[in-house]
Amino acid sequence: MFDLDEELKKLPAKPGVYIMHNNKDEIIYVGKAISLKNRVRQYFQSSRNLSTKIQQMVSNIDHFEYIIVDSEMEALVLECNLIKEHRPKYNTMLKDDKSYPYIKVTVNEAYPRVLFARQQKKDKAKYFGPYTSLGAVKDILDLLRRLYFIRTCNRNLPKDIGLERPCLYYHIKQCKAPCQGYISEEEYRKSIDEVIEFLNGNYALVTKDLQAKMKAASENLEFEEAAGYRDLILSVEKLSQKQKASDVDGVDRDIIAFASTGDEAVAQVFFIRDGKMLGREHYHITGVANESRSSIMTNFVKQFYAGTPYIPRELLLSEPLEEEELISEWLSTKRGQKVRIHVPKKGDKERLVELAEKNASLVLQQDSDKIQREEAKTIGAVRHIADMLSLPGIYRMESFDISNTNGFESVGSMVVYENGKPKRNDYRKFKIKSVQGPDDYASMREVLTRRFSHGQKEAEELAKKNIDISHGSFTRYPDLILMDGGRGQVNIALEVMNELKLTIPVCGMVKDDNHRTRGLYFDNVEIPIDTHSEAFRLITRIQDETHRFAIEYHRSLRSKAQVHSILDDIDGVGQTRRRALMKHFASIDAIKAASMEDLMAVPSMNKLSAAKVYEFFHTSSERGTETT
C-alpha cells in the first residue's frame, strides 16, 4: 500500500524526474525538478496556485516514483525522453511525432553514393537536410541521377568492378556504370563534388552548364537532347524556387510561432538552412488550456528537439521560454556549439516570426472548420438520428449482420460506432454454431444472445474481482442496436433483449428493392430519412461497413474450406505444406499451373511432395478449378 505522507517525507532535495501514476498504474504526468523534495510536495499542499488541469491530475494520483540525477540538465533530458515514450495524459503533448529525411552522400567510399537517410549517423558521410517531406527528397534524388549519373547500387566498389552486368540505370543513361570501370574514380569524384555544390544550393552554376549544353545540342540539330536539357533546367529552377532565400546571412535557424484556442494549439516551424527556406511544417499540440503562452512554447521546444537529431544555430521564437538558459545549454550540448534563442522585436526576423504565427493561425482555423464539418457528419448526424427516434441521446451504436452462402459457413458481424465514428477495436465476428442451413433469423438470434449474455457473464466476473466492468471486452452496452433489416430482424433482437432482461432500443435499417437504404424501422413504424441528410449518410456508412465486415469473414472461412477440401486429398501433403503452398502461390489455380521446379522452390517442399502435387493436378482431366 502506497503511504503518501511517508513517501513525501522520503523525497530527497536533489535534482531528478518525478513520475505520477493513477490507480491503473498508468503514467499520467512526468515532470522535472531541481529539488524533488520541494517540487513534488507542492502538488499536495494548497491547490490555490495550481491550474485546473493540474488540480485534476493531482486528484487522479494513486502513487508516484522518482529518478535522481546529477544535474538539472540531466533531469531535462530524462523528462523529455519519458514524455516522448509514455505520452502522459496531463502533460502538454505534441501530437505529431515526425522524423525528417536527409540526403546522405557517402564521401567515405571510393565511389560515393547519394542516398535517402532517416537520421544522421556518425559514419563519416555528409548529410544534407532535414527536408520536410519524403517526396521532396525523392524528387531531388531523381534530379541528381539525371544530372550527374551517380550510382544507386550497393556494390562494393572498386572490389566488385566487372563482377556483374550493369544495372537498368546504365541502359537508360542515368548512371555511368562505375561498376564496369567505365568511369575513373577521379572523374566520378568530380561528379560527386558537383552534387555537393548542388545540395549546398549552388543552382546557378548547374543552370548555366545546362543552358550551354542545351544551346550546343540545338545548334547540332539534336532537338530531342536539347529538350531533355530544357526539362532539367525547369526542374532545377522549380527546386530553387521552393528553397528561395529568406535571409542573407547563411545561418541555419528554425523560426517557431503558434496559435491556440481552448485546449488545442498549432505550432508552425520554418526551417532555414544556409539562409534558404528549406520548408515549413505545422504541429498539433493538446492539453494547453490554462497554460501560459511561454509554457506552451517551452513544452513544444523541449519535445520537438528531444526527437530531432539536427539542432540549428539559432531559434527565433514568438514567445520567451520559461527555462531559456537551461534549454539553450541543452541544445548547445546536442549541437556541439552555442545555440542562440531569441524573440525578435524588429526587422526581418520579427517579420518572419509574424509570418509563422499567421500560418499557425490559418492552420488552426482550417482545423476548426474541418472539425465542424466532421462533427456535422458524425455527432450532428447521431443527434439527428436520436431526434428521429425520440431518444434522449446516443453515444454508442452496435450494428449486426449475417452472411452465408446457402447456409454454408454462416457468420455474424458486430460493428461499433461511437459518436458517429467507427471503433474498430470493438468490432466482433461470430461463427454460427447452432444453426443448420440458411436461416438468418435463427443465426441473428444466436449472435445477439452470445454477444449480450457474454457481456452479462463478464460483468459478473469482473464485479466479483472488484474490477471496473468498463475493462471488459463485451461489458460496454450500446445506446442503440442497429439491425440490417426491417421488422423481422428487429423483432428477433427485441425478443433477445426481453429474454436477457435488457432494455436497449432496437432499430432496423430498411433497404429498398435496389438494396439502398430507405428508412429506419423503430417502435413498429418505418421512419423515412432525407437522403440528402448527414443522418442518412451515416446510416448508409454503418450499413455498408457491417455488411463488409460480415462478408469478408464469411469469404475467408469459405476460402479456407475450399483450400482444405482440395489439397487435403493429396497424399504426403500435410497442413504445413498446404499452408506453404497457399502462401507461396496464393490460389489453387496458381498451384495447378506450377511446374515441378516451381513447386520444389516452395519452403518445406521436396522433390517427392512436389511430384505428388504435380501428379494430383495433371493426371485427371476431370479435376476442377477452384480459387480462393
Curated annotation (Swiss-Prot):
Alphabetized SUPFAM superfamilies for the sequence: C-terminal UvrC-binding domain of UvrB (SSF46600), GIY-YIG endonuclease (SSF82771), RuvA domain 2-like (SSF47781)
Keyword presence, Ribosomal protein: no
One GO CC annotation: excinuclease repair complex
Subcellular location: Cytoplasm
Pfam family, one: UvrC_RNaseH_dom
Similarity comment: family membership: Belongs to the UvrC family.
Protein name as it appears in the record: UvrABC system protein C
Gene source species: Lachnoclostridium phytofermentans (strain ATCC 700394 / DSM 18823 / ISDg) (Clostridium phytofermentans)
Name of the gene this protein is made from: uvrC
